Amino acid sequence: MAEIDTQVLELETGPDPVCSIIFLHGLGADCHDFESLPNMLDLPVGIPIRFVLPDAPMRPITINNGMVMRGWYDIGFDIDRGLCPDGLEDSARMMRTLLDREEQRGVAAARLLLGGF
């Protein structure tokens, strides 16, 4: 199993989760931004769910004058910057690793949700 080189906060609503929600925070935030997500959702009682909340890597963000902050990819000013901003491929690999890890932990692919803000 590939390693994840960032903090990942995991919350479970019960033992032996049958589904997992991987949720990504927004620019400059961290994994604790959605720590209250399980309590905010009107989840069915008795269905154990694992919430996987990873931190984005620290990187310079062009639109914020190059300030180093958590971001899944660089955001620039140029509308013609291309289809793959710096960092996007690395973040996609990280998401694939997290999805693979959940499958290896016994959660079926059909019961994995990847989302974010």
PLM-predicted stretches and their roles:
Residues G116:
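The Walker A (P-loop) glycine that initiates the GxxxxGKT/S ATP-binding motif of P-loop NTPases
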Residues A2-L113:
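Serine-hydrolase catalytic machinery in alpha/beta-hydrolase-like enzymes
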